[in-house]
Amino acid sequence: MTRVVATGTFDILHPGHVLYLSEAGKLGDELYVIVARDSTIKHKRKPLVPENQRLFMVRALKCVDHAMLGSEDDMFKPIREIDPDIITIGFNQHWDEEALQRQLIERGLKAKVVRITKCDTAPYASSRHIREKIKESDC
């Protein structure tokens, strides 16, 4: 059985997230999703949607078999617990595949890192784009 892990913030869940998770799920038999904790998100602005609500929405997706919040202390802790065969990263996630692969190997983890490519068929496939559209609207 091939276990696949996908990670992300999933703030303002949108079609791009669903496509990313769906493509990740096709790589194996079980898809585990690790949702970033509010307290660990440092590379962008604070999420609009609280972590428990983001987790609830990710769990509701048909393509997701298991979903959990990440660790506040050690980002590799849930990875060690799941022991996946594949770890996916999205086209716009800041990870360098080779550097992440090295970090996994250093920790005795054998998962292969796979970047999921961008899907241009979804018009609102970016949380940033959605925020910009909201700002432009008369709401």
From Swiss-Prot:
It is an enzyme of class 2 (transferase). GO terms for biological process: FAD biosynthetic process; FMN metabolic process. It holds the Pfam family CTP_transf_like. ATP binds at T9, F10, H14, P15, G16, H17, N92. Signal peptide: none annotated. Pathway: Cofactor biosynthesis; FAD biosynthesis; FAD from FMN: step 1/1. Keywords: ATP-binding, FAD, Flavoprotein, FMN, Nucleotide-binding, Nucleotidyltransferase, Transferase. SUPFAM superfamilies: Nucleotidylyl transferase (SSF52374). InterPro entries: Archaeal_FAD_synthase (IPR050385), Cyt_trans-like (IPR004821), FAD_synth_RibL (IPR024902), Rossmann-like_a/b/a_fold (IPR014729). One of its GO terms (molecular function) is FMN adenylyltransferase activity. Its cofactor is a divalent metal cation. Catalyzes the transfer of the AMP portion of ATP to flavin mononucleotide (FMN) to produce flavin adenine dinucleotide (FAD) coenzyme. Homodimer. This is FAD synthase. It comes from Methanocella paludicola (strain DSM 17711 / JCM 13418 / NBRC 101707 / SANAE). The gene is ribL.
